[in-house]
Amino acid sequence: MNAMHNAPASDPSLVYPSPLKEFWQSFAHNKGALGGLLFMLLIVFCALFAPWVAPYDPSEQFRDFLLTPPSWLEGGQARFLLGTDELGRDLLSRLIHGARLSLLIGLSSVVISLIPGILLGLLAGFSPNRAGPLIMRLMDIMLALPSLLLAVAIVAILGPGLINTVIAIAIVSLPAYVRLTRAAVMTELNRDYVTASRLAGAGTLRLMFVCVLPNCMAPLIVQATLSFSSAILDAAALGFLGLGVQPPTPEWGTMLASARDYIERAWWVVSLPGLTILLSVLAINLMGDGLRDALDPKLKNAA
């Protein structure tokens, strides 16, 4: 009799997966997101271990091998897999070391814009009649300007360089986090659990950071992923315009700028950095789509 009562409890069909396992199953179901994750893991590995992965120092010049084509083309050298640039520097080594800066800029700008964006969004959501309108009008003004133009203006004021590039991209990304956080907060404030917390005597800070904010993180995680790809793209654009990281530091946008005069007779010095930017941004966007599908209950149920 006891065995009959205990049988349903041991039925595997009644055992629910953990939230992490359920998230991974939903994310891995999206083949594009999984491919993007694998590509980004490769980029991160190369960036972290660049001194050991790269065949040469990114600034080392081989004067006898200027604009050498990739190894599979006529005139290529096996020692230079992706060829060399106009100064005889190994292109593969510069791309690998350039990944470090691109990932650093993307991660730093996301963190710098995410934290104040969440705080301002919470303040705007909890103060809809006072601070909220002022914050949102300021965000509307920032959104009215093209993001790249605003970033160029900020860097032009602060001066070119790595830190100023990160600051400019972070400022440009700020309105998206503020608006998204405020919208999520306004939705959550009408939930029963928030009302129950108020009646239980929870203060404003507890409501903000303990009750409401954890339930707003799913869209913010997706937005942070998409902003990461936008930051890499903006950093490359600023570097191409000469306002980002300055030569001879290897950075994908700067590599494009220095090689644009050789596009007709040495296509690889322009195409390969551009292709690296394209694939990295595409991989991160695919990851963002997978995260959105895995974290959004509506999309998960629809699937």
Swiss-Prot record:
Q: Where does it localize?
A: Cell inner membrane
Q: Name one Pfam family in it.
A: OppC_N
Topology in membrane? Multi-pass membrane protein
Q: Enumerate the transmembrane spans.
A: 33-53, 103-123, 131-151, 152-172, 202-222, 225-245, 267-287
Entry-linked CDD domains: TM_PBP2 (cd06261)
* Key word Cytoplasm present: no
The effect of disrupting this gene, in the record's words, is: Deletion of the dppBCDF operon leads to reduced ability to utilize di/tripeptides as nitrogen source.
Stored InterPro entries: BP-dependent_transpt_permease, MetI-like, MetI-like_sf, OppC_N
- A Gene Ontology BP annotation from the UniProt entry: protein transport
One Gene Ontology cellular component annotation? plasma membrane
Gene Ontology molecular functions: dipeptide transmembrane transporter activity
Primary localization? membrane
Bridged cysteine pairs (disulfide): none
Enumerate the spans annotated as ABC transmembrane type-1 domain: 99-288
Q: Which keywords belong to this entry?
A: Cell inner membrane, Cell membrane, Membrane, Peptide transport, Protein transport, Transmembrane, Transmembrane helix, Transport
Could you give the subunit structure recorded for this chain? The complex is composed of two ATP-binding proteins (DppD and DppF), two transmembrane proteins (DppB and DppC) and a solute-binding protein (DppA1-A5). Five orthologous SBPs (DppA1-A5) are present in P.aeruginosa, which increases the substrate specificity of the DppBCDF transporter.
Tell me the protein family, please: Belongs to the binding-protein-dependent transport system permease family. OppBC subfamily.
| Primary role | Part of the ABC transporter DppABCDF involved in the uptake of various di/tripeptides. Is also involved in the uptake of phaseolotoxin, a toxic tripeptide inhibiting the enzyme ornithine carbamoyltransferase. Responsible for the translocation of the substrate across the membrane.
Q: What is this protein called?
A: Di/tripeptide transport system permease protein DppC
Please give the organism: Pseudomonas aeruginosa (strain UCBPP-PA14)
